[in-house]
Amino acid sequence: MTEIPSPIDQLLAGNKRYVEGKTTSSNKPGHRHELSEVHAPLAAILCCSDARVVPEIVFDQPLGSLFTCSVAGNIPTTEMIESLEYAVSFLGVQLLIVMGHTSCGAVKEALASEFPRGLFSHIALPSVPNLHEAIMHNTKESLKTILDRSPLILDSIESGDLTVASGVQDIASGKFTVLDCYQAEE
């Protein structure tokens, strides 16, 4: 019997196809009709609202397979966390990813400190003002914030129903690299 790949394995395989220019995902008209009847995404993703970051394309997934929450700097606001909880509780996603990306304008502006008070104030910055390190730090901290603020998501991990991960997409190459991954211990 063939083992079904885990959701994270499926997304990483899709990202490999995307990086290699061998995408297979298509969104045919018949698929839209199916989606009008069922909403069962494979994963939930908190990502940046940057127009260059489109999880369905980056992970080579068809319409309906990803529940995407996007906000500048992939900041886990209360509304974003509640949306992710909805995906876990009611849609049954088995994977939650916080997806940062290289060349993030929101993190860059937060580092520059030349913005109106409050704008990007929730971006987690490391003590070293290096853009690459700041992007990785912010992505990891966004996942930690979700885990700190959502008992529902934490319980879903502990019960073995959910895997959570953080990672960064390289805009130039398209490659997504996992930074942290948490799942129930077996």
Give, region by region, the residue ranges found by the protein language model.
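Divalent-metal-activated hydrolytic enzyme cores
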Residues: 1-38, 64, 73-91, 106-186
